[in-house]
């Protein structure tokens, strides 16, 4: 559960880091006030009286991974349509009202959740609660609103995926690695399925999943918990709860009719594109997350990620960029907050004159050494110090607490998990880290390798080229 900092902040010295870590390990993270309304809406309030500002977020426990065959993209589509108005607030008026009152708003969709947020002067909290509660139950959709917006999301996919070689590589790597998981399809959706979404699909999704008993209201800022509770009961309290289906994830990723996944055991993807001038290497491993059964491993992998691929002192950066100089950049990213196992990402950019195969060999060498010898006790101690400091830094914005809490609660964690995170990180041992690392990167590792190359020039291994050429994907998904 990486704490969201809002903005990356540099810590000036080791002395500051040590003092922050000491405080973080002995204190709670956000100290929220938590209650549940009679209709099942969870409410979380975090006080921050530094400025007369407030952030409201409403998180729904549904995302792209909950979509069914033939309807990929519907979660993100409805997110767009939530701004189309209600009987009392016209299309597009929601954001205009927020802006006229000096605030800003937006929304986002990922695999396990959909979230909506506003940041505004604290004395306007009642206004944004009224607006958000209104669209939780009164969204009004017509064909005239829905189908032009479908064109918008299709164009968004073209801009973000089709026109981005790096995004297409990432999409195809997820696909070949996570074929048996809904995380293997793009959160934005497969293009052919997006183009077939209807008004009825959007309304059905809204009526199925958008309910107070499937939502979390988070308020962070210059507020008093009792005042927030009174407003929540006034505006959200009257919304009736309704049964929400269990989040049953398919065991086999569903693709559009006639499409087939890449044959096993090949899990390599090479993408060539005329727009690419700088080759890129990527590797995705399947890793556990903060679910109840794998929380201990996730904590240990967070510590490992600090050692392995975070920053210029990491094992990966030092080996590839500083020592062998085969790369100009190298790092990793661990997606630990999710309902199901997901990718642990490694990336590197070859240095001028260096072949991408040298980069891959360098990455493999670093991983092999770690699997063989493990990390050191000092590396673990230093990594925990850096991580624990985030517990204090995460309080320095309104969006940080709201995002960290919402992401955690929509993916099966509890308030206690969030508040005890510093202590849990402090309890991670060298053995824990090495065991978790070997579980992901050892002999039974599941991974996909990706090469992003210019249209001409650098040659890829034949098995990678063959794998890429045999990939059959939905039209527009990978190419």
Model regions and ranges:
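N-terminal secretory signal peptides that target proteins for export/translocation
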Residues: 1-6
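Bacterial N-terminal signal peptides
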Residues: 11-22
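Non-catalytic beta-strand/loop surface segments
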Residues: 25-64, 88-123, 160-214, 238-291, ...
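Short pre-active-site segment immediately N-terminal to the catalytic Zn-binding motif
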Residues: 63-71
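Solvent-exposed, non-transmembrane alpha-helical starts
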Residues: 69, 126-129, 163, 230, ...
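Active-site SXXK
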Residues: 72-86
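A common structural junction motif
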Residues: 133-141, 235-243, 364-375
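Non-catalytic, conformational "gating/processing" segments within enzyme and secreted inhibitor domains
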Residues: 150, 203-235, 445-446
């Amino acid at each position: 559960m990486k704490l969201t900092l809002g903005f990356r902040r540099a810590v000036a010295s080791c002395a500051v880091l040590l003092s922050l870590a000491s405080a973080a390990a002995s204190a709670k993270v956000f100290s929220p006030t938590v209650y549940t309304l009679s209709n099942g809406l969870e409410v979380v309030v975090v006080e921050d009286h530094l400025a007369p500002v407030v952030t409201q977020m409403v998180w729904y426990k549904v995302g792209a991974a909950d979509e069914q065959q033939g309807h990929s993209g519907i979660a993100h589509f409805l997110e767009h349509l939530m701004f189309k108005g209600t009987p009392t607030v016209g299309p597009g008026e929601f954001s205009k009202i927020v802006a006229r009152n000096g605030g800003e708003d937006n929304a986002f969709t990922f695999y396990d959740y959909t979230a909506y947020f506003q940041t505004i002067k604290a004395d306007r909290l009642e206004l944004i609660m009224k607006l958000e509660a209104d669209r939780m139950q009164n969204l009004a959709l017509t064909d005239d609103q829905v189908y032009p917006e479908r064109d918008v999301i299709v164009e968004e996919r073209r801009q973000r995926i089709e026109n981005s070689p790096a995004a297409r590589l990432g999409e195809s790597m997820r696909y070949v690695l996570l074929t048996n998981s809904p995380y293997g399809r793009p959160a934005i959706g497969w293009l052919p399925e997006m183009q077939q979404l209807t008004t009825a699909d959007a309304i059905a999704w809204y009526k199925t999943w958008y309910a107070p008993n499937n939502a979390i209201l988070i308020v962070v800022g210059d507020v008093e918990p009792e005042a927030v509770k009174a407003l929540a009961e006034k505006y959200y309290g009257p919304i009736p709860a309704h049964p929400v289906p269990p989040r049953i994830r398919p065991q086999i990723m569903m693709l559009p009719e006639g499409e087939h996944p890449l044959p096993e055991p090949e899990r390599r993807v090479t993408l060539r594109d005329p727009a690419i001038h700088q080759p890129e290497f990527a590797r995705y491993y399947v890793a556990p997350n903060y679910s109840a059964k794998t929380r201990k491993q996730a904590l240990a992998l967070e510590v490992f990620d600090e050692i392995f691929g975070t920053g210029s002192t990491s094992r990966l950066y030092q080996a590839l960029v500083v020592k062998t100089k085969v790369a100009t950049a190298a790092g990793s990213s661990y997606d630990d907050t999710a309902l199901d196992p997901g990718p642990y990402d490694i990336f590197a950019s070859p240095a001028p004159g260096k072949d991408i195969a040298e980069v891959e060999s360098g990455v493999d060498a670093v991983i092999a050494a770690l699997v063989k010898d493990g990390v050191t006790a000092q590396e673990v101690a230093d990594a925990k110090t850096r991580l624990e400091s985030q517990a204090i830094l995460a309080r320095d914005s309104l969006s940080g607490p709201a995002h960290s809490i919402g992401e955690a609660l929509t993916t099966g964690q509890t308030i206690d998990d969030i508040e005890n995170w510093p202590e849990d990180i402090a309890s991670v041992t060298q053995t824990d880290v090495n065991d978790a690392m070997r579980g992901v990167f050892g002999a039974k590792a599941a991974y996909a390798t990706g090469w992003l190359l210019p249209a001409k020039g650098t040659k890829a291994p034949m098995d990678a080229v063959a794998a890429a050429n045999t990939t059959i994907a939905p039209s527009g998904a990978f190419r």
